[in-house]
Amino acid sequence: MQCALYDAGRCRSCQWITQLIPEQLSAKTADLKNLLADFSVEEWCESVSGPEQGFRNKAKMVVSGSVEKPLLGMLHRDGTPEDLCDCPLYPSSFAPVFAALKPFIARAGLTPYNVARKRGELKYILLTESQSDGGMMLRFVLRSETKLAQLRKALPWLQEQLPQLKVITANIQPIHMAIMEGETEIYLTEQQALAERFNDVPLWIRPQSFFQTNPVVASQLYATARDWVRQLPVKHMWDLFCGVGGFGLHCATPDMQLTGIEIAPEAIACAKQSAAELGLTRLQFQALDSTQFATTQGEVPELVLVNPPRRGIGKPLCDYLSTMAPRFIIYSSCNAQTMTKDIRELSGYRIERVQLFDMFPHTAHYEVLTLLVKQ
């Protein structure tokens, strides 16, 4: 992939950009096989990859510069700002949004936050696009509510320029730290969730719910999990760390009992909305801590699907699953190192199947799906 920002030495986020995609996939596969070298893996499935550029559905832009000439991008370690509006990972549909946002910031008087001086209001711009209809969600991350009235007043101009903006919010993040968002979300539009669709499954994206950034590969990941589950004798499953319900909603059948657990209430609201649309009445989604939920249950499903954050599922949940011994575990991981550590803690399971998904091209990161079967 050609990138003027990389060639000019202005951005080094894509550390593997000089390697061809097949070379990147080979290196990632070798890394995964090395991590799982102590285990017997029955089947290595072919790796899945997607487009090498224009694939991201989300932009997280630090706002810097001045109110008259804002920069959208990132800050280098020395505090120097870098405009990333031309990043080739973003789809072409993002360019007109960035182009309209710069004069809008001036119109609304949203002074960019200056980290060194601890002054200013606008910290980040967060943009998400739906692949199904091109609708977008725009979030202004502000230090306080000081400029909220000005933002509301100027908003009709932006909506006229960009009718694709379906959901617009102001997120209040008052802490002087590199934290992307605060707890308070103020909706500036009537619509509060962005409609998405993968493999004919309706999904919803709300401001504070996690959603995969590579929709082409994510939809293949969910479809693969569904295919694996359909091959198993499963009538009851748990979907832990379920997010907006992507895995559970794909895997569920009308006669299957499924419980999805996620700590973020916003994500659970999305999952419930999707389940209602699909008419799946035996699905239950609850906003709870996944480990706490699992370890207080008396009954055990045939299948537990886990999709934890980078830290993995951790020893308490591993110990519980080892004791309760569900027949199958499907582990989806964005960090194969912590997944490997967790699998070591899961006693009495063999690895039936492993598949790598290249969710993050041009970096060392990847997603992996693993099927574990009780011995």
Curated annotation (Swiss-Prot):
Binding site for [4Fe-4S] cluster: 3, 11, 14, 87
InterPro entries in the record: 23SrRNA_MeTrfase_RlmC, MeTrfase_TrmA_AS, MeTrfase_TrmA_CS, SAM-dependent_MTases_sf, U5_MeTrfase_fam
Catalytic residue list: 334 (nucleophile)
List of residues binding S-adenosyl-L-methionine: 212, 241, 262, 307
Classification via Pfam families: tRNA_U5-meth_tr (PF05958)
EC number assigned by the record: 2.1.1.189
Record carries keyword Metal-binding: yes
Any Gene Ontology biological process: rRNA base methylation
Catalytic activity: uridine(747) in 23S rRNA + S-adenosyl-L-methionine = 5-methyluridine(747) in 23S rRNA + S-adenosyl-L-homocysteine + H(+)
Sequence similarity: Belongs to the class I-like SAM-binding methyltransferase superfamily. RNA M5U methyltransferase family. RlmC subfamily.
The name this protein goes by in its record: 23S rRNA (uracil(747)-C(5))-methyltransferase RlmC
Organism: Escherichia fergusonii (strain ATCC 35469 / DSM 13698 / CCUG 18766 / IAM 14443 / JCM 21226 / LMG 7866 / NBRC 102419 / NCTC 12128 / CDC 0568-73)
Gene: rlmC
